[in-house]
Amino acid sequence: MKLTSVVIVAVLFLAACQLTTSDGSRGTWKDRAVRSITKVSMLRWPCKVAGSPCGLVSECCGTCNVLRNRCV
């Protein structure tokens, strides 16, 4: 019974901490997503132009046509 009470109090405490800290970070998820996309795109450059050969791991600027093995 004591263990159950301690677990319930701990869960409620952690939930309260999550709720109080989430108000201060409102609207930053979009910024984080944009930053992560920018970082990924910077890591992948330089990309291959259209007509270049591509494989299973696409390094094309656009998409990879797997059937023709060429960047589109």
Swiss-Prot record:
Name of this protein: Conotoxin Lt6.3
UniProt xrefs under InterPro entries: Conotoxin
Domain of life: Eukaryota
Source species taxonomy: Eukaryota, Metazoa, Spiralia, Lophotrochozoa, Mollusca
Localization in the cell: Secreted
UniProt keywords, alphabetically: Disulfide bond, Knottin, Secreted, Signal, Toxin
A molecular function GO annotation: toxin activity
Range of residues in the leader sequence: 1-22
Tissue spec: Expressed by the venom duct.
Disulfide bond sites: C47-C61, C54-C64, C60-C71
Family: Belongs to the conotoxin O1 superfamily.
Organism, as annotated: Conus litteratus
Propeptide stretch(es), residue numbers: 23-46
